[in-house]
């Protein structure tokens, strides 16, 4: 390990491979089935799915996808309509699917330093799969971004004065 657990941080897609293996081992299901049963169905997301092969990208509009192989990412890609991306984030962070202690952990971000180019945060941080930080105006933004050939997607949730709003932009 590069760090003693809890003392350091570095983003790594390999980390998501370990999460994939953990989900499959604990649930006894393939990742696709576990996501459908434990996330997509409970959150009411009928069109979101996992893409692991080029054939899985049929009908997905994401820039220059014709030459894109989602297999380069260990865990695959979540694909679906933008409105369901915003709903996923809103319902996941604002609902009761996850226990309160886990939501707190998801929001316990490790500070990453100063602003990151192309990101909305003045004071960015990273937690359990969640990018989070303070944006201009003092709003707390939580979410994530992703990119592929010819495309970028951002899904954010803003919580201010007890009210939340989520959006997704492609």
Residue ranges of model-derived segments:
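Short, well-ordered beta-strand elements
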Residues: 144, 152-170
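Glycine-centered tight beta-turn/hairpin loop motif at sheet-sheet or coil-to-beta transitions
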Residues: 125-127, 148-150, 162
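Short, surface-exposed coil-to-beta transition loops
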Residues: 73, 149-153
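Short, surface-exposed loop or secondary-structure junction motifs
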Residues: 1-145
């Amino acid at each position: 390990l590069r760090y003693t657990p809890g003392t350091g941080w570095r983003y790594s897609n390999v980390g998501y491979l370990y999460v994939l293996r953990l989900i499959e081992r604990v649930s006894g299901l393939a990742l696709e089935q576990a996501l459908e049963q434990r996330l997509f169905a409970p959150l009411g997301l009928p069109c979101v799915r996992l893409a692991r092969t080029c054939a899985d990208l049929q009908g997905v509009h994401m820039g220059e996808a014709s030459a894109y192989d989602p297999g380069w990412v260990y865990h695959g890609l979540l694909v679906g309509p933008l409105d369901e991306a915003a709903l996923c984030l809103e319902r996941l962070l604002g609902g009761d699917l996850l226990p309160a202690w886990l939501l707190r952990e998801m929001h316990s971000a490790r500070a990453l330093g100063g602003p990151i180019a192309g990101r909305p945060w003045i004071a960015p941080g990273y937690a359990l799969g969640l990018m989070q930080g303070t944006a201009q105006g003092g709003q707390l933004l939580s979410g994530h971004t992703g990119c592929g050939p010819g495309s970028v997607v951002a899904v954010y949730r803003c919580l201010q004065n007890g009210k939340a709003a989520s959006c997704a932009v492609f």
